[in-house]
């Protein structure tokens, strides 16, 4: 049922539904830092966890690593560094008491290249080194949707890559919110009235492999991984998790699942 109806949830609602399902099955949520595994005879037997300033060893029969943007760090702790990159992406929430972004609108996407600054604005900004790459023709992809008493604007036209982010929450550049807002002007010109309004900006990392296929499958005996879902994590997570669970339990898996196995980076063929 959860898989069939996953599209009816937002990201937070989906997370809460999964947490409630875990608790209903007797699972519990424990906070800590994953430090690696302890091995006996070459096999991983327990996870090393730091909790409340103490390091603990948690024995397991099967360990699944699904740490989202923490995946590069978790793989390094395991001694399995794989060729991953992390792209910081940001979203901006703008208050919209006048309803300039229609409340009944679906997710809107502008799928054409665009220039987000007028010629007179570009003349004023061309000496700003950080803004210079944004002054020309930018790729498509600006999107937004209503949320609460405002709307979310998302546009990362020139994403950068980080090989080893130190955390899960990148710091947004000061202009991230305005860039996202300007990206929606072709769709909703009335949003120009919100220039100068201070948005709430946050973000995270899109972790990806070189060919932009996820990691799903065994890393070593007893250790499995699910991650590098790029920018489609919420959409793909439940189907991917279902496939990984079936595989780990020795059940039949979809033919496509094995194409995502992390061993592809170790197989010369």
Give the predicted meaning of each segment.
Residues 1-21, 68-70, 176-183, 229, ...:
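Mid-domain beta-loop-alpha active-site segment that forms a flexible
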Residues 97-221:
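Active-site lid/adjacent beta-loop-alpha segment flanking the redox-cofactor pocket in flavoenzymes
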Residues 21-25, 70, 77, 243, ...:
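Active-site catalytic microenvironments for nucleophilic, acid-base chemistry
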Residues 53-125, 173:
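Central helical "cap/lid" subdomain
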Residues 30, 64, 214, 224-226:
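Hydrophobic/aromatic beta-strand patches that form the interior of the parallel beta-sheet core
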Residues 10, 14-18, 33, 43, ...:
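Internal, well-ordered alpha-helical segments in soluble enzyme and binding-protein domains
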Residues 219-269:
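C-terminal lid/capping helical subdomain adjacent to the catalytic/cofactor pocket in oxidative enzymes
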Residues 1-61:
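Helical element adjacent to the flavin cofactor pocket in flavoenzyme catalytic cores
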């Amino acid at each position: 049922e959860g898989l069939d109806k996953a599209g009816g949830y937002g990201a937070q609602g989906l997370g809460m539904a999964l947490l409630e399902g875990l608790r209903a099955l007797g699972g519990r949520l424990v906070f800590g830092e994953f430090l690696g595994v302890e091995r006996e005879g070459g096999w991983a037997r327990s996870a090393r966890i730091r909790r409340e300033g103490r390091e603990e060893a948690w024995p397991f029969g099967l360990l699944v690593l699904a740490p989202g943007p923490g995946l590069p760090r978790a793989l390094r702790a395991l001694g399995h560094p794989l060729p991953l990159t992390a792209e910081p992406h940001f979203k901006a929430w703008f208050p919209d008491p006048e309803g300039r972004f229609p409340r009944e609108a679906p997710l809107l996407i502008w799928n054409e290249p665009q220039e987000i600054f007028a010629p007179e604005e570009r003349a004023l900004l061309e000496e700003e080194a950080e803004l210079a790459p944004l002054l020309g023709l930018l790729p498509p992809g600006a999107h937004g949707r209503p949320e609460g008493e405002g709307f979310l604007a998302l546009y990362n036209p020139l994403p950068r890559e980080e090989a080893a982010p130190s955390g899960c929450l990148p710091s947004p550049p000061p202009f991230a919110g305005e860039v996202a807002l300007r990206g929606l002007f072709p769709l909703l010109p009335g949003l120009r009235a919100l220039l100068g309004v201070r948005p709430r900006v946050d973000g995270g990392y899109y972790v990806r492999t070189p060919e932009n296929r996820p990691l799903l499958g065994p890393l070593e005996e007893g250790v499995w991984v699910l991650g590098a879902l790029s920018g489609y994590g919420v959409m793909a997570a439940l189907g991917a998790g279902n496939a990984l669970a079936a595989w780990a339990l020795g059940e039949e898996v979809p033919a496509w699942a094995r194409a995502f196995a992390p061993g592809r980076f170790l197989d010369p063929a």
